[in-house]
Swiss-Prot record:
It is a single-pass membrane protein. Cholesterol transporter that mediates non-vesicular transport of cholesterol from the plasma membrane (PM) to the endoplasmic reticulum (ER). Contains unique domains for binding cholesterol and the PM, thereby serving as a molecular bridge for the transfer of cholesterol from the PM to the ER. Plays a crucial role in cholesterol homeostasis and has the unique ability to localize to the PM based on the level of membrane cholesterol. The chain crosses the membrane at residues 557-577. The gene is GRAMD1C. GO terms for biological process: cellular response to cholesterol; intracellular sterol transport. It comes from Pongo abelii (Sumatran orangutan). InterPro entries: Cholesterol_transport, GRAM, PH-like_dom_sf, VASt. GO terms for molecular function: cholesterol binding; cholesterol transfer activity. GRAM domain binds phosphatidylserine in the PM and mediates protein recruitment to endoplasmic reticulum-plasma membrane contact sites (EPCS) in response to excess cholesterol in the PM. This is Protein Aster-C. Residues 265-276 have a biased composition (Basic and acidic residues). Keywords: Cell membrane, Endoplasmic reticulum, Lipid transport, Lipid-binding, Membrane, Transmembrane, Transmembrane helix, Transport. Residues 1-34, 212-237, 250-284 are annotated as: Disordered. Residues 69-136 form the GRAM domain. It is found in: Endoplasmic reticulum membrane; Cell membrane.
Length: 662
């Protein structure tokens, strides 16, 4: 942790005015005080906004009510305006592991543990956090988070979903550092993300609830929405250098964010900062008629709000509703392809999709034509087989994809398609499915914007380890899939524009795109692979041959395994027969021994004393004979030893005489 810049150091590098504001806030919230039981308690300064007291009327979930009441009861020193946003089961590493719960609100991070009436209470103001990282328990298990303040370090471990918990805390921490307050709509969106399945409301009621809460959102007197938006944009432009440096510092340990956060904040920030300064007034006027912009996003799409503020070369994008899914945004860029051409490439049996399916090892593709539904939407169904290389999922899996073209779509202007994908042969396939949303927005006659967002849906709730395994594999596969799709679309874009544009313009266009796009480094390699056009296109004969080879391989494997199992069964039968024979022989020998012992006992009772004396005499006579023979043998041995000794003496004398003569 040495060398990690503190909040004040980073703020001094960015803007002195914003640093002064945060410095005043830190002074209002003093450093933690350590009590006798090593409990850290921090006091909160005056809050920037006040929540209305009628918000709890809408909560129908007793679980959230219980959590919030428990939170208020355990942390009575916090202001009444603090509302619980999320809570996680974890443990604090001290001399021993203190198992408890971590509570997250808008301005505070609190921990409570009660082990045999030994209570531990910790309250950390988010603005006092200087650094936070993902850690590993015992340098092996990735389930820990370390929180660092100016005076202490807190090591929380045993998280069920470490990456999600870290992301939530990190976003609220950044929100506090930027001096942003949650709106009521944002607060309810966070509750939906953390307690959505336990609130007891359906999606339509949740949406109406968010809109009604937004309509009655309190405002401070004498302050218009234009002033509020202007102040927010001004603070955002002032602190843009601070956020970029802070996020880049933490992104080294944030493997869960992947390339989307790097592409959003790392490379587009300087461009959006300039555009925000140039078009500040038009942006503020738009905010008066639209829903307020989000100050944070727990779905890993930090650059969405910045992307929306940038101006495009057409007015069509502004009039199109952007409805991304709540998961992740994988593609968001403008292609030099018309909107209708993009739709044909992605949602028809085009040569592009055939090549793309072949490169992704997708075979046996069968699709139905677009059919109109009663509600005005259009439906298309696809079935195919995905050849897999993972040892955990098998050789291949069948998949069904249901594509829905919504009635809000306008030909050659705007297309919104939802793709629901179900895989049938992967582990835990009955627990989850994925939903992809494609938004094709016309920018100009030969340009369109493609936005692809994805969400992971659950049919039934799995337990923690299974859920983390599903999310890890699913998000990794989806990210690789859409990176490949974006790269192939760039190649197709260059092929389509090659006949229209001059070579010089095309070279300049590629050069500019290479410096802007996060996936442009992979484009030259892919273009060299697909430069021949139809080289990667697999014919039906090739697909059939691959399928037959796979079937033959499976049959051969089954035959070999059957023979092996049969041999094992025969070996077990042989061993069983031998073991039974050995057991029978042992029982026979035991019975014979018992009979001999019984006969000896009976003989000893019948034999008379005279016979016993005679036997004793006979034994004594035999012993005398043995002793006599032993004595004779000892005498012979003695004579032999004497002769041997004489022989050795004679040899020694001869050797001594020879030595003297020499």
């Amino acid at each position: 942790m040495e060398g990690a810049p503190t909040v004040r150091q980073v703020m001094n590098e960015g803007d002195s005015s914003l640093a002064t504001e945060l410095q005043e806030d830190v002074e209002e919230n003093p450093s933690p005080t350590v009590e006798e039981n090593n409990v850290v308690v921090k006091k909160q300064g005056p809050n920037l906004h006040n929540w209305s007291g009628d918000w709890s009327f809408w909560i129908s979930s007793s679980t959230y009510k219980d959590r919030n009441e428990e939170y208020r009861r355990q942390f009575t020193h916090l202001p009444d305006t603090e509302r619980l946003i999320a809570d996680y089961a974890c443990a604090l590493q001290r001399d021993i592991l203190l198992q408890g719960r971590l509570y997250l609100s808008e301005n505070w991070l609190c921990f409570y543990s009660n082990i045999f009436r030994w209570e531990t209470t910790i309250s950390i103001a988010l603005k006092n956090i200087t650094f936070m990282t993902k850690e590993k328990t015992a340098r092996l298990i990735p389930n820990a988070i370390q929180i660092v303040t100016e005076s202490e370090k807190f090591f929380f471990t045993s998280f069920g979903a470490r990456d999600r918990s870290y992301l939530s805390i990190f976003r609220l921490w950044q929100n506090v550092l930027l001096d942003k307050s949650l709106t009521r709509q944002e607060f309810w969106q966070l509750l939906q993300q953390n307690y959505g399945t336990e609130l007891g409301l359906n999606a339509e009621e949740m949406e109406n609830l968010s809109l009604s809460i937004e309509d009655v959102r309190p405002r401070s007197p004498g302050r218009s929405s234009l002033d509020d938006s202007g102040e927010r944009d001004e603070k955002l432009s002032k602190s843009i250098s601070f956020t970029s440096e802070s996020i880049s510092r933490v992104s080294e340990t944030e493997s869960f964010d992947g390339n989307s956060s790097k592409g959003g904040l790392g490379k587009e920030e300087s461009q959006n900062e300039k555009q925000t300064k140039k078009s500040l007034l038009p942006t503020l006027e738009k905010k008066l008629t639209r829903v307020p912009s989000k100050s944070l996003d727990l779905n890993k799409n930090e650059y969405l709000s910045l992307e929306k503020s940038s101006t495009s070369d057409s007015v069509d994008e502004e009039n199109v509703p952007e409805k991304d899914l709540h998961g992740r945004l994988f593609i968001n860029r403008i292609f030099h392809i018309s909107a209708d051409r993009m739709f044909e490439l992605l949602f028809t049996s085009s040569r592009f999709m055939q090549k793309f399916a072949s490169s992704r090892n997708i075979i046996d593709v069968v699709s139905t034509p677009w059919t109109a539904e009663l509600g005005g939407d259009q439906l298309r169904t696809m079935t195919y087989t995905i050849v897999l290389n993972s040892p955990l999922t098998g050789k291949c899996t069948a998949a069904t994809e249901k594509q829905t073209l919504y009635k809000e779509s306008r030909e050659a202007r705007f297309y919104m398609v939802d793709s629901e994908v179900l895989t049938h042969d992967v582990p835990y396939h009955d627990y989850f499915y994925t939903v992809d949303r494609y938004c094709i927005i016309r920018s100009s006659k030969q340009k369109c914007r493609l936005r692809v967002s994805t969400d992971l849906k659950y049919r039934k709730q799995p337990w923690g380890l299974v859920k983390s395994l599903i999310e890890k594999n699913s998000w990794g596969s989806l990210e690789d899939y859409f990176k490949h799709l974006e790269s192939d679309l760039l190649i197709e874009e260059s092929i389509l524009n090659q006949a229209i544009e001059d070579p010089g313009k095309l070279t300049g266009l590629r050069r500019r795109r290479r410096t802007f796009n996060r996936t442009a480094e992979t484009v030259p390699k892919l273009s060299s692979q697909h430069s021949s056009g139809d080289v990667g296109l697999g014919t039906k004969a090739d697909i059939t041959g691959k399928k037959k080879e796979m079937e033959n391989y499976n049959i051969t494997l089954i035959v070999v395994m059957s023979i092996f199992v049969l041999l094992l069964v025969l070996l077990n039968v042989t061993l069983f027969l031998k073991l039974s024979k050995i057991e029978h022989a042992a029982q026979s020998f035991y019975r014979l021994r018992l009979q001999e012992e019984k006969s000896l006992n009976l003989a000893s009772d019948v034999v008379s004393r005279a016979e016993t004396i005679q036997n004793n005499k006979d034994q004594a006579h035999r012993l005398k004979g043995v002793l006599r023979d032993s004595i004779v043998m000892l005498e012979q041995l003695k004579s032999s030893l004497i002769m041997l000794q004489k022989t050795f003496d004679l040899l020694n004398k001869n050797k001594t005489g020879m030595a003297v003569e020499s």
